[in-house]
Amino acid sequence: MMVLVALIAGASSSAFAQADLAKSKNCMACHAVGSKLVGPAYKDVAAKYAGQKDAEAKLVAKVIKGGAGVWGPVPMPANPQVSEAEAQSLVRWVLAQK
């Protein structure tokens, strides 16, 4: 039972760390977990890319380089302040949203 509690606590702490990283990199200025703002909700991104083998690599590139045309007319700006490791971590967190 203690191991399960520790695993749940660790997962929650990791999720909070990823949310904090998303805030610190200004992702949350345009995105939210459960609702569309300027950009799509993270839950919608996770649903759209579910089961796609190249989703992580595609989204990491989009986080860093920006992109347009996937979710409507508003382009996602490039984010050169986000490292590749940070982008991978953020994308994994986004893709885990349900």
Regions found by a protein language model. Give the residues of each.
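Sequence/structural segment immediately N-terminal to covalent heme-attachment motifs in c-type
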Residues: 16-33
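Domain-level signature for proteins that mediate thiol-based redox and metal-cofactor handling
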Residues: 16, 52, 56-57
